[in-house]
């Protein structure tokens, strides 16, 4: 490049890329980094470069809780269990799978509500389906919330049904906050969602998400075992110090 400086390019999503100029960008990049194994492999296929690295550079840290007791009391006057979903209302996040799973769960266990955080192109259709299925009392669309991490304190389970994730920052946040997780393993989720840390769903079917969520809601002992291991994983592998060390090593090697 004209500036004659070393360039490191980190890609944190896992969407397929296209175009001549996009490929050209990578030709003039000294080192390419993918945030997960899936992102790394996508970059290798697109760039035809074998030197693509993987650094999972989403750092998590403890934050101050915002007290949301009053909001929770209004949303959940029956003090039921809360299934949290933090995902945009877009096709790849599969909100209709969430909806179907929660409908099935409610037929077995009505002692919960579901709070779905996120906005997107499917918002109106989701609203219509919730009303059409009579789910408005227990499936609540929360829209986009700036203070989303404060809501994690009130979750009994986090549900993730996404078709494709670069890594899955909401999963890492749940691990740090010791919230039990039910998730698939699509894309970068495979790097962080494993049987010792979460309830893993392999089929992508609403029935499986329902079953695994019900298991966690009814088994606090199992939830405790999973969240303890998940917490140890995230503080070790996703601290700022650990990620900084990996990039520091990369920069040193690049500048030799």
Question: Where does each model-flagged region fall?
Answer:
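A conserved mid-protein helix/loop that constitutes part of the nucleotide-sugar donor-binding site
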Residues: 81, 85-107, 121-127, 169-172, ...
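Short hydrophobic beta-strand element within catalytic cores of glycosyltransferases
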Residues: 180-183
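Aromatic "clamp/platform" in nucleotide-sugar-dependent glycosyltransferases that forms part
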Residues: 144, 163
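Acidic anion/phosphate-binding donor-loop and adjacent secondary structure
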Residues: 20, 41-45, 58-79, 150
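Nucleotide-activated donor-binding/catalytic signature segment of Leloir-type glycosyltransferases, i.e.
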Residues: 127-143
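A conserved, positively charged/aromatic
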Residues: 7-34, 47
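Conserved acidic donor-binding segment of nucleotide-sugar-dependent glycosyltransferases
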Residues: 195-206, 215-220
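A short, well-ordered alpha-helix in the C-terminal region of glycosyltransferases
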Residues: 208, 215, 222-237, 243-249
């Amino acid at each position: 490049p004209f500036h004659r400086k070393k360039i490191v390019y980190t890609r944190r999503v896992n969407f397929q890329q296209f175009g001549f100029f996009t490929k050209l960008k990578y030709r003039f990049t000294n080192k390419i980094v993918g945030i997960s194994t899936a992102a790394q492999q996508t970059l290798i296929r697109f760039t035809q470069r074998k030197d693509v690295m993987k650094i999972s550079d989403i750092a998590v840290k403890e934050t101050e809780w915002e007290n949301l007791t009053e909001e929770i009391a209004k949303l959940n006057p029956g003090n039921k269990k809360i299934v949290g979903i933090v995902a945009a209302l877009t096709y790849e996040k599969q909100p209709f799978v969430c909806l179907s799973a929660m409908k099935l769960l409610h037929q077995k266990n009505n002692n919960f509500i579901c709070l779905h955080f996120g906005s997107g192109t499917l918002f109106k259709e989701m609203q219509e389906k919730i009303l059409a299925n009579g789910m408005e009392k227990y499936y609540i669309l929360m829209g986009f919330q700036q203070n989303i991490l404060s809501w994690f304190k009130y979750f009994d389970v986090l549900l993730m049904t996404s078709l494709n994730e670069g890594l899955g920052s909401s999963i890492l946040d749940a691990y740090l906050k010791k919230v039990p997780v039910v998730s698939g393993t699509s894309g970068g989720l495979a790097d962080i969602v494993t049987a010792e840390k979460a309830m893993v769903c392999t089929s992508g079917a609403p029935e499986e998400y329902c079953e695994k969520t019900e298991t966690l809601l009814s088994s606090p002992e199992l939830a405790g075992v999973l969240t303890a291991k998940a917490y140890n994983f995230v503080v070790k592998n996703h601290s700022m110090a650990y990620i900084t060390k990996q990039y520091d090593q990369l920069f040193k090697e690049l500048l030799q």
